[in-house]
Amino acid sequence: MLEAKEFTAREIAALTWEQFHFTLPLSLGGFLLMLSPLIIAAFVGRSADSTDMLAIHYVTLGVANPVAYAALRMQPVAIQFRPEYDGDRRLLAYAIAAGAVLGLIPFAFSLPCIGDWYFGHYQNVPPRILDTVKLAIGIYSFICIIHAVRGRIEGIAAARKCPKTVMAGQIAYTVGLFCTCLVMLPLGIAGWKIAVTAIIVAPVCTTIAVYAMLNLPKSVRTT
């Protein structure tokens, strides 16, 4: 039986910092996902017909955001089952399949029977915007695949102990979110379209940023 190892105060502090440094970027991803509806609402509230646009924004994300968060849990899966060799795409295929299955949940709410009951009766959405609500939640079906793929690449970066790479992805998420809203709002685009576009663009920016940094030469990339 192995004896318990005694650590010095300095070793404990170093280990604690390493654990914090490892988990913070991953936790930040979930935090930004939860915070993004509020950030986007500041722009949607300044669009035409803002009352209706905000109603569409919040009522659809009430369904889409929890499912997207579930898809982002691909992070620990990627940490545990990271690629075993260059070109190993098994986890990528699994992430896409898992995201597609999760995407069936918001898709179901876009169907007339479920959508009319949930949004029209349960959430009391006005009839004038009911069709737009169902269209928006149908588009959000694809966000699950995007977040699952994002979670995979972030998990791989974490498994390689590249926290700065993961953090760069979170920065890309925030920049993508703000830039999309800043560009679309002055163009007079409907608020719900701004929201849907921003929520899709932001995780795509994260995925591209993390993937690009992981593929930089080690002499260029710092972890």
What is each stretch, according to the model?
Residues 1, 52, 111, 115-116, ...:
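Membrane-interface helix-loop junctions in multi-pass transport and translocation proteins
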Residues 1-33, 216-223:
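Interhelical loop/hinge segments that connect adjacent transmembrane helices in multipass membrane
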Residues 17-22, 41-65, 87, 127-134, ...:
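Interfacial/gating helices of multi-pass transporter permease domains
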Residues 23, 30, 58-61, 95-99, ...:
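Residue-level recognition of transmembrane alpha-helices
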Residues 35-44, 78:
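Hydrophobic/aromatic end-of-helix segments at the C-terminal termini of transmembrane alpha-helices
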Residues 56-109, 150-161, 165:
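Small-residue-rich hydrophobic transmembrane alpha-helices
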Residues 62-67, 126-153:
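Alpha-helical transmembrane segments of multi-pass membrane proteins
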Residues 92-141:
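C-terminal transmembrane helical hairpin of 12-TM major facilitator-type secondary transporters
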